[in-house]
């Protein structure tokens, strides 16, 4: 301060240097006024700087590698696969004869005491018998077939879970790549805004600008800091989802995605729609349920037929009497009222499952068409952004910087050009994310694999 005061005293001795003194003191005041926000910006950028170093050190992981890892490790897929394996054991249980029954019988005569009358009556005996129930021919086969169809539906559900998890993996991976690229855009524009702020300070210090321009630039820099902080939060959320799908420890190293780039769709809308019935996993699951219900209706029809039981018993008497041998054959007479209700229920279930499949198909077809329109529109928009809007905005800001530096344009025009560059860059990345997300959804709906 003594050095500054001394210099000011010397300059005041000469009337011709009064203007220089005013400019010098103005620069001191303005630098002290805006030192705190700049220091905050520097401190706030330090975590991002360390994150950038991690991104530079780590290597991006291709999406295909993560998909293969998810197929092996995803807990949700493991649960569905275990359920499918368990369902395969139902058919042998349903298609096997009922358990045989064995009987040991003792018949007393003249007294409730065991073996009473055994030696003096030919009615007293010790019997050993066995019996077996036989369902009407075809019932066991149909019961096993129904169980097989149940297992087929559970197996089809495995593919539903698999495709759902892969779609979640893809969309989260794309969103993480979007955050990574938009974060770079925010940092680049923060540097550009700092350049604009410095020029605004220079204009303000020379009396050609006003303090409002400087404060407005600093406010925008603070907003960028907020956006960067929100990006860090979203990155952490995406990392948690990816590690859950891959069954990695949540404190393991972060996954670095490859840069997001546009993949143009080579299928026509009609080709995608044609693949829905044959390749959509939800439609296939509904088809398996239709087959199951059809087989259950056949079984309900067969339940009108009676079941049979055969039993045989050997009855041993005393040596002086002859033994007894008894063969029995029995048949049940099914009550028709509950059987008719069961058959009607099975037939309604067939209609219901067919209606569910039709509703599912129509919903998928509509969603495929919707996503197809989104993809084609975003492809056009990406070209407009890449070849038109963004280059024009960049040329405008460069011309504006040059003009503002030489005081040939005002701050508002320059700031508007800067906001155009920032918003168009972010809009391009958002459109690119929407495009890739729609492609992942198309893959899930139609069953196609896109490059």
In which residue ranges do the predicted regions lie?
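Bacterial N-terminal signal peptides
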Residues: 18-31
């Amino acid at each position: 301060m003594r050095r500054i005061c001394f210099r000011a005293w010397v300059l005041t001795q000469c009337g011709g240097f009064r203007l220089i003194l005013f400019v010098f003191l103005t620069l001191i005041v303005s630098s002290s006024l805006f030192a705190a926000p700049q220091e905050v910006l520097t401190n706030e950028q330090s975590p991002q700087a360390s994150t950038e170093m991690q991104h530079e050190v780590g290597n991006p992981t291709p999406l295909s590698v993560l998909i293969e890892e998810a197929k092996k490790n995803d807990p949700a897929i493991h649960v569905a696969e275990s359920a499918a394996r368990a369902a395969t054991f139902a058919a042998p249980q349903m298609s096997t004869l009922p358990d045989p029954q064995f009987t040991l019988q003792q018949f007393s005569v003249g007294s409730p005491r065991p073996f009473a009358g055994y030696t003096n009556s030919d009615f007293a005996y010790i019997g050993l018998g066995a019996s077996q129930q036989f369902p009407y021919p075809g019932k066991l086969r149909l019961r096993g077939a129904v169980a097989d169809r149940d297992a087929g539906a559970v197996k089809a559900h495995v593919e539903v879970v698999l495709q759902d998890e892969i779609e979640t993996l893809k969309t989260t991976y794309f969103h993480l790549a979007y955050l990574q690229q938009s974060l770079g855009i925010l940092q680049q524009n923060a540097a550009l805004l700092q350049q604009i702020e410095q020029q605004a300070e220079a204009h303000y210090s020379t009396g050609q600008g006003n303090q409002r321009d400087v404060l407005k630039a600093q406010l925008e820099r603070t907003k960028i800091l907020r956006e960067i902080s929100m990006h860090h939060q979203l990155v952490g959320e995406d990392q948690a989802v990816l590690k859950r799908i891959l069954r990695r420890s949540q404190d393991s190293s972060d996954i670095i995605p490859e840069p997001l780039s546009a993949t143009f769709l080579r299928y026509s809308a009609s080709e995608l729609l044609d693949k829905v019935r044959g390749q959509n996993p939800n439609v296939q699951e509904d088809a398996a349920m239709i087959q199951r219900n059809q087989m259950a209706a056949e079984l309900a029809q067969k339940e009108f037929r009676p079941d049979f039981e055969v039993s045989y018993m050997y009855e041993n008497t005393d040596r002086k009497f002859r033994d007894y041998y008894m063969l029995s054959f029995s048949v049940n007479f099914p009550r028709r009222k509950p059987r008719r209700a069961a058959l009607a229920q099975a037939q309604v279930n067939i209609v219901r499952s067919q209606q569910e499949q039709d509703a599912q198909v129509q919903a998928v077809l509509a969603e495929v068409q919707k996503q197809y329109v989104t993809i084609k529109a975003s492809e056009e928009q990406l070209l407009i952004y890449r070849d038109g809007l963004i280059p024009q905005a960049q040329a405008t800001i460069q011309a504006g910087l040059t003009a503002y530096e030489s005081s040939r344009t005002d701050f508002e025009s320059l700031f508007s050009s800067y906001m155009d560059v920032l918003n168009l860059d972010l809009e391009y990345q958002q459109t690119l994310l929407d495009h890739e997300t729609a492609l992942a959804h198309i893959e899930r709906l139609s069953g196609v694999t896109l490059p």
